[in-house]
Curated annotation (Swiss-Prot):
Family per similarity comment: Belongs to the bacterial ribosomal protein bL35 family.
InterPro entries with a match to the protein in the record: Ribosomal_bL35, Ribosomal_bL35-like, Ribosomal_bL35_CS, Ribosomal_bL35_sf
Keywords assigned: Ribonucleoprotein, Ribosomal protein
Gene: rpmI
Name of protein: Large ribosomal subunit protein bL35
GO CC annotations, alphabetized: cytosolic large ribosomal subunit
Sequence ranges of Basic residues compositional bias: 1-16
Domain of life: Bacteria
Region (Disordered): 1-21
C-alpha cells in the first residue's frame, strides 16, 4: 500500500497549535480594503481556529503535519 501524502496546499494554510488544534488565517485580506471599516480590517489580521465541523476533514489532509 502506498504512503499517505500530506496535501501540500493545506499544509501551507493551516498550522498546528500546541494543544492540538488547527490555526487558520482569515480570507478577504489581500485587497479592496476601501470597502471595509477599520474594525473589520483589524479583526481580519488575527488568526482563528478551524471550526469543529471542518477539523476532521482537514486533519485527514494533514496526516504528517507536526
Amino acid at each position: 500500500m502506498p504512503k499517505q501524502k500530506t496535501h501540500r496546499a493545506s499544509a501551507k494554510r493551516f498550522k498546528r497549535t500546541g494543544s492540538g488544534g488547527l490555526k487558520r488565517f482569515r480570507a478577504y485580506t489581500s485587497h479592496r480594503f476601501h470597502g471595509k471599516t477599520k474594525k473589520q480590517r483589524r479583526h481580519l489580521r488575527k488568526a482563528s481556529m478551524v471550526h469543529s465541523g471542518d477539523f476532521k476533514r482537514i486533519k485527514a489532509m494533514l496526516t504528517r503535519l507536526k
